[in-house]
Amino acid sequence: MSEAEARPTNFIRQIIDEDLASGKHTTVHTRFPPEPNGYLHIGHAKSICLNFGIAQDYQGQCNLRFDDTNPVKEDIEYVDSIKNDVEWLGFHWSGDIRYSSDYFDQLHAYAVELINKGLAYVDELTPEQIREYRGTLTAPGKNSPFRDRSVEENLALFEKMRTGGFEEGKACLRAKIDMASPFIVMRDPVLYRIKFAEHHQTGTKWCIYPMYDFTHCISDALEGITHSLCTLEFQDNRRLYDWVLDNITIPVHPRQYEFSRLNLEYTVMSKRKLNLLVTDNHVEGWDDPRMPTISGLRRRGYTAASIREFCKRIGVTKQDNTIEMASLESCIREDLNENAPRAMAVIDPVKLVIENYPQGESEMVTMPNHPNKLEMGSREVPFSGEIWIDRADFREEANKQYKRLVMGKEVRLRNAYVIKAERVEKDAEGNITTIFCTYDADTLSKDPADGRKVKGVIHWVSAAHALPIEIRLYDRLFSVPNPGAAEDFLSVINTESLVIKQGYGEPSLKAAVAGKAFQFEREGYFCLDSRYATADKLVFNRTVGLRDTWAKAGE
């Protein structure tokens, strides 16, 4: 990592400091355990930065472990994308990649140990009956009629489950804890269920698969994890985490600590809702630049450094809160303002003809790649008597606040000449098709000799040298800050979240590559699209505007 700022402080790091100072632990070992059933999103980035960042700062280790206990929903596609996302964010896992499926034999043995201790039983209630028997937050559950089977019978039935003797949903293994517990998670939770599905790592070896709560704690213990960090929705599950480890023969007992998950305005984080956006074609895929997925943010032009900075700024607490989208946008805007080279592109073009410029001629003007960083060098940009400017940069009449080109008045072309609007041509509908101007030949990158003041500056692209470009103006996917609270979250999709324009860019953009952003001067930050751009068709995505227009609109 390139950031050299001071180490962040939060309650988890305070716990680690105390554990190291007291000698409870001599090293720090964390893990990031995603389920490979979807693409990682910005909320996962917070967990990645926390777990890998802690390991890095304490010279410890962080494992990447795939919680692959549900073969029906998982796929190697997701495994590969998760590995790519973690590496792209700038982190490296310790040793080999782990899979929960690596421990299936040990997990099975621990399940047998619980049966032998009278702490687990095979239940033949249907899934619906199990839910009914579980009770509610205000009413205790009731015991299954199969709860008091003998150890021998449970061992035989569990082996029958393992060898495929039951159909799916006809039997499961449950922990024998307390059906009257005030914590529903402790009311005889399911430890194993039957699934006849091929697993991406183990093939068809198993037809019984352990549940998350049984797998997670044992995997942590087998890997020697010292601090198991989860989001707050797993707070009650900590009781089951500890119960399992307290009741099996295992030398290590990690501790689980919970922190608040990331909630971000104008988007959803639910994997189910994100999947619905993809499968119902509201977006183009998991890497759609409007999605909060890491792959979507990357394609939109977000940098790994900006996401790490965002995660650092929001911090780690136990308080649930919702972060303004402007906070994320501010991080990428600051990053690109500092590091992105400048270029000129016209998004809504209108032709401008300089009538007194030598006909058919052109020249090169020198432009800095960054106004404040001379080390980024400069480039030569062609200029000619016919250029494209943005339609919004010209008005036939305007008040004094309008600092662009107005009929009969002057404006400066960026790093070029002062021009004056003389007349226009319009089509049959009254739309301006061409603006005719004159230029002051003695004003190339300098003020007029007679001392007259020209306040406005607009950007431009030489028509004879322009590259046709497609510009995808991405915006927030939803029109309200909390779409998840809507009765139908799909009903509040922002219909203007993608606007496609055909414009022109300066010739230097021919060398653009995906993942490297530009500031299109006076327009915003853009990057070449990794999916649609080709050598013959340049497609640029808007990463973020030059300023927060949503805040202005809400005032």
Curated annotation (Swiss-Prot):
Motif ('HIGH' region): 34-44
CC terms in the record's Gene Ontology section: cytosol
Intracellular or extracellular location(s): Cytoplasm
GO molecular function, one term: glutamine-tRNA ligase activity
Organism domain of life: Bacteria
A single BP term in Gene Ontology: glutaminyl-tRNA aminoacylation
Main location: cytoplasm
Enzyme nomenclature, EC number: 6.1.1.18
SUPFAM superfamilies referenced in this protein's UniProt entry, alphabetically: Nucleotidylyl transferase (SSF52374), Ribosomal protein L25-like (SSF50715)
Complex and partners: Monomer.
Protein name, per record: Glutamine--tRNA ligase
